[in-house]
Curated annotation (Swiss-Prot):
<comment type="function">
    <text>Secreted chitinase involved in the degradation of chitin, a component of the cell walls of fungi and exoskeletal elements of some animals (including worms and arthropods). Plays a morphogenetic role during apical growth, cell division and differentiation (cell wall morphogenesis).</text>
</comment>
<comment type="similarity">
    <text>Belongs to the glycosyl hydrolase 18 family. Chitinase class III subfamily.</text>
</comment>
<feature type="glycosylation site" description="N-linked (GlcNAc...) asparagine">
    <location>
        <position position="61"/>
    </location>
</feature>
<feature type="active site" description="Proton donor">
    <location>
        <position position="155"/>
    </location>
</feature>
<dbReference type="InterPro" id="IPR017853">
    <property type="entry name" value="Glycoside_hydrolase_SF"/>
</dbReference>
<protein>
    <recommendedName>
        <fullName>Class III chitinase ARB_03514</fullName>
        <ecNumber>3.2.1.14</ecNumber>
    </recommendedName>
</protein>
<feature type="glycosylation site" description="N-linked (GlcNAc...) asparagine">
    <location>
        <position position="278"/>
    </location>
</feature>
<keyword id="KW-0325">Glycoprotein</keyword>
<dbReference type="GO" id="GO:0006032">
    <property type="term" value="P:chitin catabolic process"/>
</dbReference>
<dbReference type="GO" id="GO:0008061">
    <property type="term" value="F:chitin binding"/>
</dbReference>
<keyword id="KW-0147">Chitin-binding</keyword>
<feature type="domain" description="GH18">
    <location>
        <begin position="23"/>
        <end position="314"/>
    </location>
</feature>
<dbReference type="InterPro" id="IPR045321">
    <property type="entry name" value="Cts1-like"/>
</dbReference>
<dbReference type="Pfam" id="PF00704">
    <property type="entry name" value="Glyco_hydro_18"/>
</dbReference>
<keyword id="KW-0378">Hydrolase</keyword>
<feature type="glycosylation site" description="N-linked (GlcNAc...) asparagine">
    <location>
        <position position="302"/>
    </location>
</feature>
<comment type="subunit">
    <text>Monomer.</text>
</comment>
Amino acid sequence: MSSVKNILSFVALFAGVKTAYAGLNSPGHNNVAIYWGADVDVIPLAFAVSIKGPGGVPQINFSNQGDPCKPFPGTDLLHCPQIGEDIKTCQKKGKTILLSIGGATYSEGGFRSAEDAVAGANLLWDTFGPVKSSNSSVLRPFDDAVIDGFDLDFEATVLNMVPFAKQLRTLYDAEKSKTFYLTAAPQCPYPDLYNKEMLEGGVKFDALFIQFYNNFCGLNNFVLGSQSQDKFNFAEWDNFAKKVSANPDVKIMVGAPANKGAASSGYIDAQTLVSVINWSKTFSSFGGVMMWDASQAWANGNFTSAVKGALSAGNSRVVRMSYAGYHSGY
């Protein structure tokens, strides 16, 4: 996609998908998430690459946002009013819009202290969460548009993320205007090196978008026709969901490259991915499929619709697709 304005073209294609409130159906198992989305329920915008960047405000980079976004003076925080309008349009069509924090270029390393972590969560909430009249001076990239939550995607060592994530959850719970979601995108080796602190530290996630690619546990090592899988380790993540997670109802999503060029390894064709979906559906924690990313899926024919069809056939619901245009780390 050449411009973030085209988020609306994805929605037009996928408007036929029926969802529960705000797109993400936490109890369901047919969600499709895409980094942005079509035949899709959840759209994480990737990425916020800094929580406290130049000027003391967050920094966002959507890679190919182009002319519609201009930085606020003295900062690297982009003002993207068109994206704000698109967010509201997507939400009216039942899509869940998340902001993904981190990615391959995130280099802050987390926070120096728990107090800094809480302050960072408050800053993100003021910047992207509900509009408060008491915070009229806050710079808001999407103007009065309010995202539906945050996705945490850290690919290097980060500190004090438990108090950060818990503060986000506290802010969610105190806000009664709508439901907000907290998700994460760990790599498939368990325990994930960079997210272990959060995953095993009492943070209540609504869904985990497991990256089953670029690793030995990737989708390319799924054995067709086998009832047990030695390398593809969805079963291990299902065990985490039921026995370790602070939220025993957390949904585990199968993360897949949306095209051959989307990841270094792990891409499988739609027919094979359907087999993975059918096998994964036997686990109660299964929540759907995540694809990286929208631009790759868009160029891959009927890949997304085939996946959505497989999910819908068994009353599985979420497809999550991310939009970033380009991300060297995936």
